[in-house]
Amino acid sequence: MKRTLLSLALGVVFCASAWAQNAPKYVFYFIGDGMGVNQVNAAETFGAAIEGTIGIKPLTFPSFPHVALVNTQSASHGITDSAAGGTALATGRKTYNNAIGVLTDSITPVTSVAVWAKEAGAAVGIATSVSVDHATPACFYAHQKHRKMYAEIGRELVASNFDFFAGSDFLKPAPLHEGEANLYDQARAKGFTIANGYKEFAKQYRKADRMILLQNKENNARDNASIPYALDRKKGDLTLADITRATIAFLQKKNPEKFFCMIEAGKIDWACHNNDAAPMVREVIDADEAVRVAYEFYRQHPEETLILITADHETGGITLGSGGYSLNLPALTSQKISSYLYTTRLKELSKRMGKKFTWDFVRRDLQEYFGFGKSIKLTAEEEKTLHDAFDNLISGKDKGFQSLYASESGLSSAAKQIVSKNAHIGWTTLGHTDGYVPVFAIGAGAEAFHGRIDNTEIPKTIARLAGYPMPEDLK
């Protein structure tokens, strides 16, 4: 027994010594919202399939040398939401679903690894592909009993002492009270420079003391909840890779010696809530492109940089295979638009075309945007499903499709379901699951992430590696 305890003690000393020798100065904490193991596998298998091979086309982050599996349950539910999951990943504490940075009593605030990094003298950035006040980023700076308290969360962002934020926009920037300034003006009063789009950022960041990078005003006028899906992107749209470049540029300017950043790929989750496979795989690939930007930084500072990417939970219960032993992932290339954006397109076409908005026209449009009748051959039943959905749409009988982040037409929903069916992809839920999520890590101290771990261990391990001060009860 004494020998066992001695061995354990020596192991702890060895690990602590190894971590001290490899303390990272630059920490990249990526979170793929909703990204379970199968989402990653789907993206890599898709890459191989479109090149005509069976297997995977390796992405950058799944090729990192250190890997772990993560439990994601919250304090209140076997299946976590993004708020409780984000709180665990940010603060090392379990809480109830919907809670942002508070304990299960709903009032006791808990600090995050980003706060600990700031206390250690690091420059700190929080970035996302969705709104800056959404659940995952909010968990790193806010303390609210419910994730939908966007106005209050936004005010906590402005009041934080962090250096850089990036995302689509604030969801509720308007004044809460008469005589109060909006959040943009409040942020400017606190020393933030606000840039709309990457070009504005590039012009402004060198002279800025603190910054908030948002997408361009044109996109925010259409949809300020997120930047566009990679599948729907147009030239000039803000990308997660842009956001990562901006994060590095600003934080390195702010403190060349030490920085911490959390960067969320938020729309993997949104695509999975919609059970929309084509944008989902491209969001994972898009997240990889952002990680690759950080990886290039790591290559310049390999002994001083830690990169890890994990997830708050799995979304959609996706399966690669829906009967039999074949996959047809190249079918996903037939879809040129997210089902969410196609709903918008149908509304605009119907309004503009009037009586010329006919089934014959829409059938040709579906061929262009989903490959139906060309790369995807429709069965008679599928053709009828689409035609019936069109009839319901123009007659006002369309019940549509509702998920957490989208309200779609029945026609758009039917189209994406046909694509998934042809790709042999299955979905079990419009919500989250309790599936394991991965951690992939590289760099200084990355070997600390291995085996099966709880989500609360991740921020604590980052803090130990980087030498950030943690609350006593977490040590």
Which sequence ranges carry the predicted segments?
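Positively charged n-region of N-terminal signal peptides that target proteins for export
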Residues: 1-4
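Short alpha-helical "patches" and their helix-cap loops
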Residues: 7, 102-105, 474-475
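Bacterial N-terminal signal peptides
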Residues: 7-17
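Residues that line or immediately flank small-molecule/substrate-binding pockets and catalytic motifs
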Residues: 8, 131, 169
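Boundary at the C-terminal end of the N-terminal hydrophobic targeting segment
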Residues: 18-22
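Mobile, glycine-rich extracellular loop/lid and propeptide segments
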Residues: 24-42, 89-96, 101-139, 157
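A post-motif C-terminal structural segment
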Residues: 25-26, 35-41, 45-87, 134-475
